[in-house]
Amino acid sequence: LLISITGYTQQNHSVNTSKVYTTRAIDTQEAPVIDGLLKDPAWDLVPFTSDFKQLQPDIGEEPTEQTQFKIVYDDKYIYVAFRCFDSDPDGIVKRLSRRDGFEGDWVEIAFDSYNDDRTAFSFTITAAGVKGDEFISNNGDFSERNSFDDSWNPIWYTKTNSDDLGWTAELKIPLSQLRFGKAEEQIWGLQAKRFYFRNTERSMWQELEPNFPGYVSGFGELRGLKNLKPQKQLEIQPYVVTQLDTYEAQAGNPFRDGNDTKLNGGLDAKIGITNDLTLDLTINPDFGQVDADPAAIALDGFQIFFQERRPFFVENKNIFTYEIGNGNDNVFYSRRIG
């Protein structure tokens, strides 16, 4: 039996000259249907925001194609709509890949929901409809290997669509997958990005100055979030595994009758005690249900490092990650367990 309790704290900081997007709650309107078409009346509650600037290759310059997005929310979900203009829709690069593959054209939305300039939750969707997600820590320090943790795999929903203007995407993100404070009216950090594959071009909503010290601390602001109710997250993933072994029976031996059966079970659970305190629980875990590790052969005396993907060990694992000198070191390597 393994139990983990994770807590969070929220910080306040002064408002800078960053961009501000103001969202609105869906009150009387029906929530958007996630079909990628952007036709639901709820989207009319708020305007699009745009004016993206290049991050690569020509920082600060106008991108080849502009991008728009808007955000609405209700008491359980936050909804994001993207409009990605493209003068040559047939040239949009759509590549299927595994989760977190980031192949072809894609867009990303990231929320610093604690407004602490240190951590953020990132959601990416490719033009082909492939999802990617990362938990960002350490202010998104690109020099640290573990600042962008793609082993974080929350539950959320998305759909994309292509038309004569380019391509669109809709995202539906449960508030239970995010961590935020208890203030009646909240300010979150906000960043949106687009990757235009044909030009290997990245553009951003909140422009970053050259050599800006950090990533999350340079986010814009998301305002208009009012009366967000604490989400009592409850996720239970039970499993049952059966095994049947057959062999040649032995006459007169009741213990060798030709077959043996085995039954095994357990569960993983994530329970939200409060909105910023989560209990992770695993009982008799079957770690064989997680993605298989890539094949590797060790020809020296050093242990091979494998990425952690087991749900129990993923939550807030950056606590045990430290940078010493020019390297990234783990005080605790969870893959030695199980």
Model-derived features: positions:
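Hydrophobic h-region of N-terminal signal peptides that target proteins for export
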Residues: 1-8
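Structural preference for beta-rich elements and adjacent junctions enriched in aromatics
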Residues: 9-338
